[in-house]
UniProtKB/Swiss-Prot annotation:
Segments passing through the bilayer: 32-52, 92-112, 123-143, 175-195
Region (Disordered), start-end ranges: 1-22
Family, as annotated: Belongs to the Casparian strip membrane proteins (CASP) family.
InterPro entries xrefs: CASP/CASPL, CASP_dom
Residues in the Extracellular compartment per record: 53-91, 144-174
Organism: Selaginella moellendorffii
Cytoplasmic side: 1-31, 113-122, 196-221
PANTHER family: CASP-LIKE PROTEIN 2C1-RELATED, CASP-LIKE PROTEIN 4A4
Cited Pfam families: CASP_dom
Subunit text: Homodimer and heterodimers.
GO cellular component: plasma membrane
UniProt name for this protein: CASP-like protein 2U10
Lineage of producing organism: Eukaryota, Viridiplantae, Streptophyta, Embryophyta, Tracheophyta
Membrane topology, record value: Multi-pass membrane protein
Keywords: Cell membrane, Membrane, Transmembrane, Transmembrane helix
Length: 221
């Protein structure tokens, strides 16, 4: 038999079987990397959420009254529930936590069972779009909390809004830490979006290459 005959499936010359194995290897590596990154993201968001939800401080706030030589001090407890924007912040982080947990369970299940969804581009598209939405949700919620924190720190004399961080220093410190961690989580989430986009469009390239190899093999047979 001529030694220069056409390569069999799985030979070094490339084949649909080799391309499918390449797709499977890429899928497994992608799942492992995304599990680690999403786990890090989840830890950041949980810490940010926990700091804001548990942040409490009781202090005395001066209330000036006309006709009185000195302001009247009233005891108040600073907490996120008092501000609508911070309720949005906490709710947004809760949504991201829920989504990330579900996505982690999905990916862990695929790795544990050696499952694959490489042929389902619709799933990759949904994941990419949802990841993008979570990233923008984190960024917008952190921006809202930053604006509220700025008003609490500096006040707004033009509309007679007083500074409150001078009376609630501990609350504002923990508040700031929570917001900074949220911004870091937003950056990590956009790294996740980038990986999702890379995986999505790589699927198109690998599948197109596999289709060309199949057509070439059919033509040579």
């Amino acid at each position: 038999m001529d030694s220069s005959s056409k390569p069999m499936n799985g030979s070094a010359g490339g084949s649909p079987v080799g391309d499918e194995r390449k797709m499977g290897d890429h899928e497994h590596e992608f799942r492992i990397s995304i599990i680690l990154l999403r786990s890090f993201l989840l830890v950041l968001v949980i810490i940010s959420e926990a700091l804001m939800v548990t942040d409490r401080e009781t202090g005395s706030v001066p209330l000036p009254f006309f006709g009185l030589p000195r302001p009247v001090f009233v005891t108040k407890t600073a907490k996120y529930e008092l501000v609508t924007g911070l309720k949005f912040y906490v709710d947004a982080l809760g949504v991201v936590i829920g989504y990330t947990v579900l996505h982690l369970l999905f990916n862990i299940g695929l790795v544990a069972t050696k499952g694959t969804v490489v042929d389902c581009k619709s799933v990759a598209w949904i994941s990419f779009i949802a990841d993008s939405m979570m990233g923008y949700l984190l960024l917008s919620s952190a921006a809202v909390a930053t604006e509220i924190g700025y008003l609490a720190e500096e006040g707004a004399p033009a509309v007679l809004w007083r500074k409150v961080c001078n009376a609630f220093g501990y609350f504002c410190t923990v508040y700031a830490i929570s917001v900074v961690i949220c911004f870091i989580a937003a950056l990590v989430s956009f790294v996740v979006v980038g990986i999702s986009a890379y995986h999505l469009f790589r699927l198109y390239g690998i599948q197109q290459q596999a289709a060309r190899e199949k057509e070439k093999l059919s033509a040579e047979m």
